[in-house]
C-alpha cells in the first residue's frame, strides 16, 4: 500500500495511460444521446493563466459528468491563433516570426492543458493559422461575397495608432483600443464589411430562443443591436432641391423644432457652406471635430459646440424656416447624421439652445400644468398632451406619434422607420498575421473573387510585418501580383487580412470534421453534433464573438449549409479569478502561475480549488489557504481509501438485507450525497456546493471507519467509497483513477456509470417538528417520519411541557403543517 499521496507520480502515470489508450477520442456517431461541450478556445499566448484554468476545469467537469451519465460527449480544443496579439508579441520578442512564435506557444499550452488532465479529444485539434483551416475561412468569405453580404466601401473607420490597424466598433472601449488602450482615431479608408445589419432583426428576435443563456448577455446583445422605432422626416433645404432627412423617435415633437443640426461629416455640409462668408471658419471647425474621439463627441459631460451654416431648411408641417447648424455631438454613423433640435423636450437640445440663444417652443404640456418656456430650467421629456401643434393639439403625445407619422406619409414628407444601433461588421485589418482576403483587383474586370479551386490564398512567410499603417502584404510583390481569374490579365491581390473574429465565428463547426479536405465540415456530422449543448467562456465576449457567431450561423442556415438556427443552446459565463480584490495582472504583481500551483500541489488540487472556491458565474478570490485546504482534503481521501483497499476488494458488491444504526445512517449519507452532487452539477452548475457535499461524505466515512469491524457492513462501506470516488472523479480525475484501480476495479473510472441514488435509502426514520404556542417556538420533538397531521396534534398535546403551558387556558385552535410544525393558539 502506498501510504503517501504522491500527486506527481500519480498524475504523470494517468496522463500517460490516457494518451496511450486515446481514452478521450470521440467517435463521430453513437446510439447514445449526443452532448457537445465546448469552452472558448484561447489565443496561444504561451502561458495558461488562472482564468484559463477556471474555464477549462468547469468544462471538464461538465464533459466528464455527462460522459458518466451515458452521453456521447464531444469535448474538443483548438487555438485562435491569428491576430494582433501574436504579431505584437513576435515584434516585442526580437522579430521572431509570428508563425514560429504561435506554433511554439501552442506546443507549450497543449502540454499545460494535458498536465491539468482535461479530457480533450486532441485528434480534433484545430489552429486557425493553419492553411487547412483558413482555406475554409476564405471559402466562407467567398460565400458571403457571392451572396451580397461582403462588400467594400470607403468609410470613416476606427484607427488604432498603437496597433496600426482598423478596429471594428465592437473593439473600441471607452474611446480606446480594447487591446492596447491607445486613443482611437477616425480615418477614411477603403474597407471590407459584412452586412450583419441585414440580420439585425433576426439576431434580436431569436434571443428569445436562447433560454439557456444568462439574461445579462442577452440584454447586452439587445442593447448593442439597439432597435428603435420612429420616423424619417424630410426637411427641404431653402432655395434648393436638397432634402435633409432626419430620423427621430419623437415625431410628436416636430412642431417644436427650432433648429437643425448636421454632423460635420454629413454629405450636404460642403454644399451648404460653399461660398458663404464663414466657409473657411466652418471648415476649420470641421477639421478639429473630425480629429476628436467618438467618445469625446458623444459623452454627456463633453461640451456641445456648434456653428451655423447660414442655410435654412423648411419644417414640413409648419412651413417655418429652421436654421441649419453643424455640431460636434452629431455623428454620421448614427441615424441619418442629423438631429432636429427640440429644446423644450430634449435636455441636450435644451442646453444647446440656451447656450446659443435658439427659441424654446413648448409643444407637449403635462396634465394640469402649463409650461412657460422662459421659466423652464430643464426640458420636459415626459408624457403629456400636444399644444401649438396644429390639428394634433390636444392629442396624447403617444397617440400623436402614430398620427403625425401617418400624416407625413400621406403627404410624402416622411415615413415610419425601424433603425438599429448595430453597424456592419468591418473585417479588414492592415496587419500581417491573419487570413488573406481572397480577392484580386483587375483594371479590366474590377473586383474578382479568387476561385474556390485556388484556395487557400497562402499567407507568405517572408514578409516585413512590423506595423507601418500600411498592409504589410502590400510590400510583398510575390504575393500582390497575380493573374486575374476572369481574364488572365495582370491583377493585384487584396493586401488586408481578415479580422480574427472571422476565424472564431465558425470554429465550432470545424471540430466535427477537422481533417476534411473537401469541405469546411461534413454536413451529416454537423447536423448530428450542432448546436453546441454547453458553451463556456467570459462575458467580455457578449457583443463580439458571441454576436458574430450567431450572425454566421444564421447566414449558413440561409445558405442551407447547416440546420441549426443558433450556435450555442446553453451559455455559462464564468467570473474572473481575482487576487487581493483585483484582476490578476503583471502590472499589479498579483499573478499566480498555474504551473507553480500544479508543481507544488498537483493538478487535482488546482482544479478542486478553482471549482470549490466560488460558484462559476461569480468572481473567485484566490486564496493560498484555500489551495492548502483542498490539498489536505485530497490527502484525507487518500488516507481514507488506501488502507481499506484490501477489504473493499473482498466486500460484497451489493447491499442486501435490512440495515440499522450506523450502517443505515452511512448508506443514507451516501445516497443523499449522490442526490445532492447530481443535482448541483446537472441543474445548477453549483460545483462549489457539490464539492462541499463530497467533503461531508468523507467526514461521515471517517466516522464509519472507526466503528468496530464486526458492526460495520462491508457492502455499505464499499458502496460509500465507490460512490465517493465516482462523485469526485470529474473534479479530481487523477487521484480517483489511482484509488479506483487500487480498490480492485478494472477500466477507467471516467468510463463508469454515474451513481444513482436510492430514494428509500435517504428516507429518514424520524423527523423533527416544531411546536409553537401563539406563534412562538416552545419545543422541538422527534416523531416518526410517516406521522399523520392528527397524530402530530395528539403527540404534541400529550407532551408534558406543552400540557403545563396550556393548562387553565382555552385552546382556540390548533394549526398543523404536515411534517413541519404544530401551532397552538390559546386565549
UniProtKB/Swiss-Prot annotation:
Superkingdom of the source species: Bacteria
Subcellular location: Cytoplasm
Keyword set, alphabetical order: Aminoacyl-tRNA synthetase, ATP-binding, Cytoplasm, Ligase, Nucleotide-binding, Protein biosynthesis
Substrates-to-products reaction catalysed: tRNA(Leu) + L-leucine + ATP = L-leucyl-tRNA(Leu) + AMP + diphosphate
InterPro entries with a match to the protein in the record: aa-tRNA-synth_I_CS, aa-tRNA-synth_Ia, Leu-tRNA-ligase, Leu_tRNA-synth_edit, M/V/L/I-tRNA-synth_anticd-bd, Methionyl/Leucyl_tRNA_Synth, Rossmann-like_a/b/a_fold, tRNAsynth_Ia_anticodon-bd
Biological processes annotated in GO: leucyl-tRNA aminoacylation
Gene Ontology cellular component annotations, sorted alphabetically: cytosol
EC number: 6.1.1.4
Motif ('KMSKS' region): 583-587
PROSITE patterns: AA_TRNA_LIGASE_I
Entry-linked Pfam families: Anticodon_1, tRNA-synt_1, tRNA-synt_1_2, tRNA-synt_1g
Enzyme class: ligase
A GO term for molecular function: aminoacyl-tRNA deacylase activity
Protein's recorded name: Leucine--tRNA ligase
Species of origin: Pelotomaculum thermopropionicum (strain DSM 13744 / JCM 10971 / SI)
Amino acid at each position: 500500500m502506498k501510504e503517501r499521496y504522491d500527486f506527481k507520480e500519480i498524475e504523470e502515470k494517468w496522463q500517460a495511460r490516457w494518451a496511450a489508450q486515446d481514452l478521450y477520442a470521440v467517435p463521430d456517431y453513437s446510439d447514445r444521446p449526443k452532448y457537445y461541450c465546448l469552452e472558448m478556445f484561447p489565443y496561444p499566448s504561451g502561458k495558461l493563466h488562472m482564468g484559463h484554468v477556471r474555464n477549462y476545469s468547469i468544462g471538464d467537469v461538465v464533459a466528464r459528468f455527462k460522459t458518466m451519465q451515458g452521453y456521447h460527449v464531444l469535448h474538443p480544443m483548438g487555438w485562435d491563433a491569428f491576430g494582433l496579439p501574436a504579431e505584437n508579441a513576435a515584434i516585442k520578442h526580437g522579430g521572431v516570426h509570428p508563425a514560429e512564435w504561435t506554433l511554439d506557444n501552442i506546443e507549450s499550452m497543449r502540454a499545460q492543458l494535458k498536465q491539468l488532465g482535461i479530457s480533450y479529444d486532441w485528434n480534433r485539434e484545430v489552429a486557425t493559422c493553419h492553411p487547412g483551416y483558413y482555406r475554409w475561412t476564405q471559402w466562407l468569405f467567398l460565400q458571403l461575397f457571392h451572396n451580397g453580404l461582403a462588400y467594400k466601401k470607403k468609410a470613416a473607420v476606427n484607427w488604432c495608432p498603437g496597433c496600426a490597424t482598423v478596429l471594428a466598433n465592437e473593439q473600441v472601449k471607452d474611446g480606446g483600443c480594447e487591446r492596447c488602450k491607445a486613443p482611437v482615431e477616425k480615418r477614411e479608408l477603403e474597407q471590407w464589411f459584412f452586412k450583419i445589419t441585414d440580420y439585425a432583426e433576426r439576431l434580436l428576435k431569436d434571443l428569445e430562443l436562447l433560454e439557456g443563456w444568462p439574461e445579462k448577455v442577452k440584454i447586452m446583445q439587445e442593447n448593442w443591436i439597439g432597435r428603435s422605432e420612429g420616423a424619417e422626416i424630410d426637411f427641404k433645404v431653402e432655395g434648393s432641391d436638397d432634402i435633409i432627412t432626419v430620423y427621430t423617435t419623437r415625431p410628436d415633437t416636430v412642431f417644436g423644432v427650432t433648429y437643425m443640426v448636421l454632423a460635420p461629416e454629413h454629405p450636404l455640409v460642403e454644399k451648404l457652406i460653399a461660398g458663404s462668408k464663414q466657409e473657411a471658419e466652418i471648415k476649420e471647425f470641421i477639421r478639429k471635430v473630425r480629429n476628436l474621439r467618438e467618445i469625446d463627441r458623444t459623452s454627456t459631460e463633453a461640451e456641445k459646440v456648434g456653428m451655423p451654416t447660414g442655410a435654412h431648411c423648411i419644417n414640413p408641417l409648419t412651413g417655418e424656416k429652421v436654421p441649419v447648424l453643424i455640431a460636434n455631438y452629431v455623428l454620421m454613423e448614427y441615424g441619418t447624421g442629423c438631429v432636429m433640435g427640440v429644446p423644450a423636450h430634449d435636455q441636450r437640445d435644451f442646453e444647446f439652445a440656451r447656450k446659443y440663444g435658439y427659441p424654446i417652443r413648448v409643444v407637449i404640456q403635462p396634465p394640469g400644468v402649463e409650461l412657460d418656456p422662459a421659466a423652464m430650467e430643464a426640458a420636459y421629456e415626459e408624457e403629456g398632451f400636444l399644444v401649438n401643434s396644429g390639428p394634433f393639439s390636444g392629442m396624447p403625445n403617444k397617440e400623436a406619434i402614430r398620427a403625425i407619422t401617418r400624416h407625413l406619409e400621406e403627404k410624402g414628407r416622411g415615413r415610419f422607420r425601424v433603425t438599429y444601433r448595430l453597424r456592419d461588421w468591418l473585417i479588414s485589418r492592415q496587419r500581417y498575421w491573419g487570413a488573406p482576403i481572397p480577392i484580386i483587383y483587375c483594371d479590366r474586370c474590377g473586383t474578382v473573387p479568387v476561385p474556390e479551386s485556388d484556395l487557400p490564398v497562402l499567407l507568405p512567410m517572408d514578409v516585413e510585418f512590423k506595423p507601418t499603417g500600411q498592409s504589410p502584404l502590400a510590400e510583398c510583390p510575390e504575393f500582390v501580383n497575380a493573374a486575374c481569374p476572369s481574364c488572365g490579365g495582370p491583377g493585384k491581390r487584396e493586401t488586408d487580412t481578415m479580422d480574427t473574429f472571422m476565424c472564431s465565428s465558425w470554429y465550432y463547426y470545424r471540430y466535427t470534421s477537422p481533417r476534411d479536405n473537401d469541405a469546411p465540415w461534413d454536413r451529416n456530422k454537423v447536423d448530428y453534433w450542432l448546436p453546441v449543448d454547453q458553451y463556456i467562456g467570459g462575458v467580455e465576449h457578449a457583443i463580439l464573438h458571441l454576436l458574430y457567431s450567431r450572425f454566421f450561423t444564421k447566414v449558413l442556415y440561409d445558405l442551407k449549409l447547416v440546420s441549426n438556427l443558433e450556435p450555442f443552446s446553453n451559455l455559462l459565463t464564468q467570473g474572473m479569478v481575482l487576487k487581493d480584490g483585483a484582476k490578476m495582472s503583471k502590472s499589479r504583481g498579483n499573478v499566480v502561475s498555474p504551473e507553480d500551483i500544479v508543481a507544488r500541489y498537483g493538478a487535482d488540487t488546482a482544479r478542486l480549488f478553482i471549482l470549490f472556491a466560488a460558484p462559476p458565474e461569480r468572481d473567485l478570490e484566490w486564496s493560498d489557504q484555500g489551495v492548502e485546504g483542498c490539498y489536505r482534503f485530497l490527502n484525507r481521501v487518500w488516507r481514507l481509501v488506501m488502507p481499506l483497499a484490501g477489504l473493499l476488494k473482498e466486500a460484497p458488491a451489493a447491499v442486501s438485507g435490512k440495515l440499522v444504526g450506523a450502517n443505515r445512517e452511512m448508506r443514507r449519507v451516501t445516497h443523499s450525497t449522490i442526490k445532492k452532487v447530481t443535482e448541483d452539477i446537472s441543474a445548477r452548475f453549483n460545483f462549489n456546493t457539490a464539492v462541499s457535499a463530497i467533503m461531508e461524505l468523507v467526514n461521515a466515512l471517517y466516522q464509519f471507519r472507526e466503528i468496530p469491524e464486526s458492526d460495520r457492513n462491508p457492502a455499505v462501506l464499499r458502496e460509500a467509497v465507490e460512490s465517493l470516488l465516482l462523485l469526485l472523479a470529474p473534479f479530481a480525475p487523477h487521484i480517483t483513477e489511482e484509488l479506483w484501480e487500487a480498490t480492485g476495479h478494472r477500466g477507467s473510472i471516467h468510463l463508469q456509470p454515474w451513481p444513482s441514488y436510492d430514494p428509500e435509502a435517504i428516507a429518514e426514520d424520524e423527523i423533527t417538528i416544531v411546536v409553537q404556542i401563539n406563534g412562538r417556538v416552545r419545543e422541538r420533538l422527534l416523531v416518526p417520519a410517516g406521522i399523520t397531521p392528527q397524530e402530530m396534534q395528539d403527540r404534541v398535546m400529550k407532551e408534558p411541557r406543552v400540557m403545563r403551558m396550556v393548562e387553565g387556558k382555552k385552546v382556540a385552535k390548533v394549526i398543523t403543517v404536515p411534517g413541519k410544525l404544530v401551532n397552538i393558539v390559546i386565549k
